[in-house]
Amino acid sequence: MAPRTLLLVLSGALALTETWAGSHSLRYFSTAVSRPGRREPQYRYIAVEYVDDTQFLRFDSDAAIPRMEPRAPWVEQEGPQYWERTTGYAKANARTDRVALRKLLLRYNQSEAGSHTLQGMNGCDMGPDGRLLRGYHQHAYDGKDYISLNEDLRSWTAADTVARITQRFYEAEEYAEEFRTYLEGECLELLRRYLENGKETLQRADPPKAHVAHHPISDREATLRCWALGFYPAEITLTWQRDGEEQTQDTELVETRPAGDGTFQKWAAVVVPSGEEQRYTCHVQHEGLPQPLTLRWESSSQPTIPIVGIVAGLAVLAVVVTGAVVAAVMWRRKSSDRNRGSYSQPTM
């Protein structure tokens, strides 16, 4: 099965030379779905593109006028040629995925009576020096891993015997080398361009608004839930301590999730014995904070007491939810077949 296209070629991409604060990522997520129809299956293709944790493009083949649409103000400045190109690539990807779905139905000996999905994620991570940290080309079929490009950007991992058919095809076409060239060149150039055009949004750091909520479970136990709201970027660390000792195993931690307004939210909870709430503190780390926050639940009259950066020996917490992980949660990896940016991709 052929890899999917990735990200949209732009003419005149800027090769910026400045140093960037932290690492950044460019991701193209897509989902193709086949559904039973009266005479033949119906198909839908949706693609979204992200810089770090910000969606800026979207395409839906079921729209009244299928076209690539802006989802961030800073990309609206692009000219007609950009939109013509990106729409053209998305439509080509949709056609390619439709063919890929049909081939996979045959290879897996499946019926057209059911619904099937083909998902994918492609993109690159850039370090503070502007160089490639890692490239991605991953696919899944019906919610299960299918094939992915390894970290060496030279070899593939196939999930089963059907995926190995695709792997052999990729190897014969030297597709990994072709894609690696794209990642090391154009993908990074696109990312630099987007970061420059959208720097007021993409390179900002909004600190979290944090508080601790108290939820009695019984006369003997209560849940303390530490909330972090309204932060950007998505990377954040929430931990609970009891008398200064981290409660990693006893902490319920949800994945960072979008708030719907361009920021993110997250919570971490612990179950504590009633009457011992003051022994527990929540610790919040985020790049938008001048120093870590420490919060404690006191009483109904003063539910939350934030203490900013207080203990001299407080260890720096290193659990970071990266943009890539957030992205992985948001999509479930897909497989596909398509032409990439400035060149054509092999078919299945």
UniProtKB/Swiss-Prot annotation:
Coiled coil region boundaries: none
InterPro entries tied to this protein: Ig-like_dom (IPR007110), Ig-like_dom_sf (IPR036179), Ig-like_fold (IPR013783), Ig/MHC_CS (IPR003006), Ig_C1-set (IPR003597), MHC_class-I_related (IPR050208), MHC_I-like_Ag-recog (IPR011161), MHC_I-like_Ag-recog_sf (IPR037055)
Cytoplasmic side: 332-348
Pfam families according to UniProt: C1-set (PF07654), MHC_I (PF00129)
Principal localisation: membrane
Region (Alpha-3): 206-297
Domain Ig-like C1-type span(s) in chain numbering: 208-296
SUPFAM superfamilies: Immunoglobulin, MHC antigen-recognition domain
Region ranges (Connecting peptide): 298-307
Highest taxon of source: Eukaryota
Keywords: Disulfide bond, Glycoprotein, Immunity, Membrane, MHC I, Signal, Transmembrane, Transmembrane helix
Any one Gene Ontology BP term: antigen processing and presentation of endogenous peptide antigen via MHC class I via ER pathway, TAP-independent
Glycosylation sites: N109
Membrane topology: Single-pass type I membrane protein
Region feature (Alpha-1): 22-113
GO cellular component, one term: external side of plasma membrane
Extracellular side: 22-307
PROSITE patterns reported in the protein's UniProt record: IG_LIKE (PS50835), IG_MHC (PS00290)
Alphabetized CDD domains for the sequence: IgC1_MHC_Ia_HLA-F
Signal peptide (UniProt feature, chain positions): 1-21
Compartments, as annotated in UniProt: Membrane
Family label: Belongs to the MHC class I family.
Stated role: Involved in the presentation of foreign antigens to the immune system.
Assembly and interaction partners: Heterodimer of an alpha chain and a beta chain (beta-2-microglobulin).
Designated name of the protein: Mamu class I histocompatibility antigen, alpha chain F
Origin species: Macaca mulatta
